[in-house]
Amino acid sequence: MKIKKWIIYGKSLKEYGKMKPMKKFSALDTFGKPVSRIGNAKWYDTKESAENIINITRTHGIPEDLVAFEVRHVAVEE
């Protein structure tokens, strides 16, 4: 049976500290760092929970002009 899981993708828009601007969106892990394999990404059961993490990140100091976020879904075998 396939179920839908959600992943947060991010892309840095400006240079900030050790971050350099990125051309493409990357899946993010639990700590908000880009991962090379999608299996290492942080998965969320609902879209709302993933969006809630983005909202918390925005209120704790990462503005929209610095990092862009997207929530995408993937069908996973269970």
Regions found by a protein language model. Give the residues of each.
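Short, mixed-charge low-complexity intrinsically disordered segments
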Residues: 40-78
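Short aromatic-glycine-(Arg/Gly/Cys) micro-motifs in beta-strand/loop hairpins
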Residues: 2-40
